[in-house]
Design a protein with these regions (language model features):
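Hydrophobic, lipid-facing positions within transmembrane beta-strands of outer-membrane proteins
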Residues: 60, 97-102, 134-139, 183-187, ...
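Outer-membrane beta-barrel pore domains
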Residues: 33-36, 86-89, 123-127, 234-237, ...
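Bacterial Sec-dependent N-terminal signal peptides
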Residues: 1-24
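Outer-membrane beta-barrel channels and translocator barrels
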Residues: 55-57, 107-109, 144-146, 156, ...
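Surface-exposed extracellular loop regions of Gram-negative outer-membrane beta-barrel proteins
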Residues: 100-121, 190-194, 198-200, 259-277, ...
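Surface-exposed coil loops of outer-membrane beta-barrel proteins
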Residues: 7, 24, 34, 73-94, ...
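N-terminal periplasmic/intermembrane-space "pro-region" immediately following the signal or transit peptide
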Residues: 18-77
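Transmembrane beta-barrel domains of outer membrane proteins
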Residues: 53, 103-105, 140-142, 188-192, ...
Length: 385
């Protein structure tokens, strides 16, 4: 039965890509079905470049992924059953499901498309209700050599950390990337200058939204430079105004995101730096431009073939609440993470990690009192194909 379903998918995708060729419904060497070919996906989740040119081969890639966890937090759940900064492992003192996702991707030398369906605590705590089942749904066409136009729903390309735990070193998401977009709705134009440099311009409905909230659009630019197969540098810029149309005072936002990934022997690490400004947004003077900044460093040491040790330090400062809104984090929040990962096979990962967050405001609730510190312990199991 499974073989028949897969064969049917090949026929359908071949039909839409054949453009009237009489023999296109017969699977041949020009058609390739791939199931679960990715094993090492760390740092891949937010890269701006995807499949670009596969020659005359029509490829269909099917994938599946399940991420389960148990988490303990020293603070209480106060946000619809989730802890403060809910993304990965957001439920306290219980087993949970981060993600269960199924994806299908099609690409050849002129057309490509991707649809990924999802379910779990990550979309439940962060996606708008009508769209919780959709992680990605977009299609693309090659306009000229090395120039692609894609449109639809995208997961975010901004930030070092992805919303999929398997694509990160840690099993938790930093406060930095929690306040960066998770998803976009719009269009991207991507040009691969050469094997090292890729440029992209994009237009979206807004900052972390599917449905437009005003008449303004978010505009962005990205540049990816692969120094070699071990070192990669990415710069993202985004400008938008989320002010409702009926408000006279506007708040134009400019967000700059720079990160690098490095894989040097047994050591892998990433560095991210962010800087943002927003007009008419200072708390003490609403006519002045406010700013925020953040940074993180994450690393992993492959101590043995199947065992890795990892850590992360993070810093986030948004005293004028450009991104945090009504939540007062004061001048800063910083944290440290330490964990151990065991990979019994290439597409399975077991991790245990400890994290501490320290804020200069008392934002965490512990029983009958407030605290400026949170301790976390997370156990995570990731399996994918």
């Amino acid at each position: 039965m499974v073989n028949r379903i897969l064969y049917f998918l090949v026929l359908v995708m071949s039909f839409f890509s054949s453009k009237g060729q009489t023999d296109s419904l017969i699977p041949s060497k020009k058609h390739k079905l791939i199931i679960g070919n990715d094993s090492n996906v760390v740092f891949s989740g937010t890269r701006i470049i995807t499949k670009t040119d596969t020659g005359n081969i029509h490829k269909i890639e099917l994938s599946g992924y399940v991420s389960a966890y148990y988490a303990h937090y020293s603070d209480e759940t106060i946000n619809n059953g989730f802890v403060q900064f809910p993304t990965m492992a957001p439920r306290n003192n219980q087993f949970g499901l981060n993600l269960a996702q199924l994806g299908m991707e099609y690409h050849d030398h002129k057309v490509r498309g991707n649809i990924t369906l999802q379910y779990g605590d990550i979309p439940e705590s962060n996606w708008p209700k009508p769209f919780t089942l959709i992680q990605e749904a977009h299609a693309g066409v090659k306009l000229v050599k090395n120039l692609w136009l894609d449109a639809g729903f995208f997961k975010s390309h901004i930030g070092l950390e992805s919303i999929q735990p398997r694509e990160n070193i840690t099993s938790s998401m930093s406060v930095i990337d929690y306040y960066e977009p998770y998803f976009f709705s719009g269009a991207k134009m991507t040009y691969q200058v050469n094997s090292k440099l890729t440029l992209q311009v994009n237009a979206f409905n807004g900052y972390n939204t599917y449905i437009e909230t005003n008449k303004n659009k978010a505009l962005g630019f990205s540049a990816l430079y692969d120094v070699n197969d071990r070192i990669s540098l990415t710069y993202n810029a985004l400008t938008c105004d989320e002010t409702p149309d009926n408000k006279k005072t506007k708040h134009q936002r400019f967000y700059h995101n720079l990160y690098g990934t490095f894989k040097l022997g047994k050591v892998s690490f990433g560095i991210e730096v962010n800087y943002g400004t927003q007009k008419n947004s200072k708390l003490l003077d609403s006519t002045e431009t406010a700013s925020m900044n953040s940074s993180l460093v994450v690393f992993k040491y492959q101590a043995f073939k199947k065992v890795g040790i990892y850590g992360r330090v993070e810093y986030f400062s948004d005293k004028n609440r450009i991104l945090t809104g009504t939540l007062n984090l004061g001048n800063f929040i910083y944290g440290g993470t330490f964990g151990i990962e065991f990979k019994p096979s290439k597409n399975v990962a077991l991790s245990t990690e400890y994290r501490v967050l320290q804020c200069d405001q008392f934002i965490f609730k512990e029983k009958n009192y407030l605290s400026n510190q949170r301790n976390e312990v997370i156990f995570c199991l990731d399996v994918w194909f």
